[in-house]
Amino acid sequence: MSIRAEEISALLKARIAQYGSTMEVNETGTVIQIGDGIARAHGLDNVMSGELVEFANGTMGLAQNLEEGNVGIIILGDYLEIKEGDSVRRTGRIMEVPTGDALLGRVVNPLGMPIDGLGPIETEHYNPIERKASGVMARKSVHEPLQTGIKAIDALVPIGRGQRELIIGDRQTGKTSIAIDTIINQKEENMICIYVAIGQKESTVRGVVETLRKNGALDYTIVVSAAASQPAPLLYLAPFAGVAMGEHFMDLGKHVLVIYDDLSKQAAAYRELSLLLKRPPGREAYPGDVFYLHSRLLERAAKLNDGLGAGSLTALPFIETQASDISAYIPTNVISITDGQIFLQSDLFFSGVRPAINPGLSVSRVGGSAQVKAMKKVAGTLRLDLASYRELEAFSQFGSDLDKATQSKLNRGERTVEVLKQDLNQPLTVDKQVIIIYALTRGHLDDVAVSDIRRFEKELNLWLDQNRKQLCDEIRKTGNLPADEEIVTAISEFKKTFQPTV
């Protein structure tokens, strides 16, 4: 076999032409200290705050403290395999999470990796976890209702799309139940829901996912879970990952609901990280910027103007109180950031009033302008009625001789409390809510025994579906209250068929 010189020279020339003399420069440092999910490294002189860095074993970290001589890095994963002397290099990127339709129905960790065993997530869309909140000119005032399906909320403390409404209360007062019911109620509302579980037990998160699946709500929901067993950096990042995923849909003109369950645990994780990074502690040992931690997160909730697609992102942050103390540091911070709060009281919960909403301490600052007109008409006096009932109830315990007006107020108050009770995972459509509250406030329930109220409501709803579907559809579609005669006739006809308990 003969070797031809011209063929070899042509091949060599082709290879030389393809050769690229590009040089890749990596800034690499060395780990000088490691422990408790925190690493200190020197040699990364030009690293940026919030930049991703990569350790020798492939674990990622986030540069947080930029000090003279070293950098404090929070480790996003298992830190036990990293040791002193290991190399760490800059990536030049900030942290991003995957987003898009591929995540709907999935359970992911704060890094966007699936943890539900259903295979990898294929998506082209990534959003940075930190983003500047929309400015004043990019926003529009909150004017569309977000129906939770919970009578006590939709009537007393209505929530609008783009609002931030805090849900605050002791542990075991039904905070997560409100979140689940709200997600279930969005089935017909064209809303994408993101449930961020921070520091929850894995069994609790599993229970939430199964409840959503059973009620057909997982199809439009993303669950971001940073379990209690996860390292503190993941608990700190989880809410930012959730809102970054939601912003993708908001930018497309869609409506998003993000639930943070709960931010007390995120604040505790941030306190842990800050103390390990040797940042100076402040009140209750929290760092000085813990207010900014929550404000920059919650300010990203917005109702965008029409020019930007009119999308919205509604935030429902949760805060867990200790012995109903809402004047503690983190609760007062978040109350001052949000547009209102729903206060759940443990003594109400244990006395059987569920959802255990305290109407005196609960308020919605912008939701009133988003409330359905029909609901605004029928529920206008509900808050005052409840407040005066609570006051009279306290006085009536001391005396038995009550005048007729006081007695009728007490009777109405008892029925109001009963009507606002609701079973778990049973959200109500707005038309059913309007009709039962109309019946209550206009005195149609005054002659129904208190013990029969819940049964009366259930049977009324079934009767309306069978006999007055048109009336319900009208309220749901227009949001307006039909003529009084129509509703009164419907209630009166049903009352003729209702059998009171003997």
UniProtKB/Swiss-Prot annotation:
Pfam families: ATP-synt_ab, ATP-synt_ab_C, ATP-synt_ab_N. One of its GO terms (cellular component) is plasma membrane. PROSITE patterns: ATPASE_ALPHA_BETA. Gene3D superfamilies: 2.40.30.20, ATP synthase alpha/beta chain, C-terminal domain (1.20.150.20), P-loop containing nucleotide triphosphate hydrolases (3.40.50.300). Its main location: membrane. It catalyses: ATP + H2O + 4 H(+)(in) = ADP + phosphate + 5 H(+)(out). ATP binds at G169, D170, R171, Q172, T173, G174, K175, T176. This is ATP synthase subunit alpha. It comes from Exiguobacterium sibiricum (strain DSM 17290 / CCUG 55495 / CIP 109462 / JCM 13490 / 255-15).
